[in-house]
């Protein structure tokens, strides 16, 4: 009974329960500690696995780089055509034609005639690249069928080449004779139609912005060129009814700086405005000296290209003006050359082109020169340059008209416009000896400064006066352009011209002053 009493003792029972709770708590703490340890180990394992994978990837990449470095370099060639059985390809590589195999991974549709291909170690085509973008330039003489062309280089050597894929594209126009092609002579392919850079370099095709209002003192010359150039374009039906052929060309000649180039530009601008919605006119401004080329026949070829371009632009009925500035530089009298005498071939080329313009009523040639006696007479005969217009040096009335173009109420003035212009003209045309000419018969003629007045000179005088007015305005002395500024500018212009006359060749003075008469034997600066 005593043992039974002790086993059911409450104190012992409580002690056992406390022990169990403590043990459970300890075990729970151990479990949580083990869980944390497991999580840490799992995270470390994941990180180690990632590092191992990264190391393997880097090792694999390094192995690949080593393999790539150990491979031989790739060769490139030009694809020519597929073999007849369609399993191999004909290529040009290393200066020889070869038949090679193609990689099974290569898409046959990427192989176009003329495309570059990359070759493997066994000369197997691995991939198709782009078309060649560098090479020689040649001029297309004529097309042979649709896929071949006859070309000529600068030396005149001709050969036949095939057209590469881009030139065979049916969505584009085929090259035309006269086009410049990019070619690979060894492969025998033409890859690209190069734009006519020489035309853009030598010519300005858009209509200028110069109008007749901008030209002063040349009313008679403007009327003459309007009658010669604009009437046939504006009233072609009247010319047809009277069976009158429009002139093929106009020659503007006279002393330098008197407005010959301005007149030609104003004609193109006036035509462009008058035809209105019907289109625009084209002004092909040929820079004469830049046509000269050391290669035989190159100057003639460029002249042909210019006229071909003019015919192309005139095909839709729009007026086209071909303007040759400094015409004497390239169309001198045949037989006058002292070196290669290139005029013997250049002049006939222009004559042939002028005669070829006969059926193109909307193309006209305008030439400008201050040495008209040097131009070959065959160019100046009727039927070629039909109209000859002399652009004289301005007289008092013309000079006043030119001054009025530059001195207007739109700029700050210290006096009325008319007063300033009258003062400038009076001072400019005041007799002041410049040079003394002794003619071949012994007579003596004294030329004054006003004998050398030109439109360009008047424009320069006004610019000088405006600069002086600006300086005085900044210094607070005067406001606006004054008569003193103009007088001082005229004196400066005359003073700076004193050291410029050339007295070594007296014959030149007959041309400089723009007069016809006896030869000059001696020149003396006064």
From Swiss-Prot:
Q: Where is the composition biased (Polar residues)?
A: 1-18
- Which keywords fit this entry according to its UniProt record? ATP-binding, Coiled coil, Nucleotide-binding
- GO CC aspect terms: proteasome complex
Q: Which GO terms describe its molecular function?
A: ATP binding; ATP hydrolysis activity
- The segment annotated Disordered runs over 1-20
What is one GO biological process annotated to this record? Answer: modification-dependent protein catabolic process
Instruction: Name the residues that bind ATP.
Output: 257-262
UniProt-listed InterPro entries = AAA+_ATPase, AAA_ATPase_domain, ATPase_AAA_core, ATPase_AAA_CS, NA-bd_OB-fold, P-loop_NTPase, Prot_ATP_ID_OB_2nd, Prot_ATP_ID_OB_N
Q: Which SUPFAM superfamilies match?
A: P-loop containing nucleoside triphosphate hydrolases
Q: Which residues form a coiled coil?
A: 20-59
Name the domain of life.
Bacteria
Give the UniProt family note.
Belongs to the AAA ATPase family.
For this protein, the record's PANTHER family field holds: AAA-FAMILY ATPASE, PROTEASOME-ASSOCIATED ATPASE
Describe the subunit structure: Homohexamer. Assembles into a hexameric ring structure.
UniProt protein name: AAA ATPase forming ring-shaped complexes
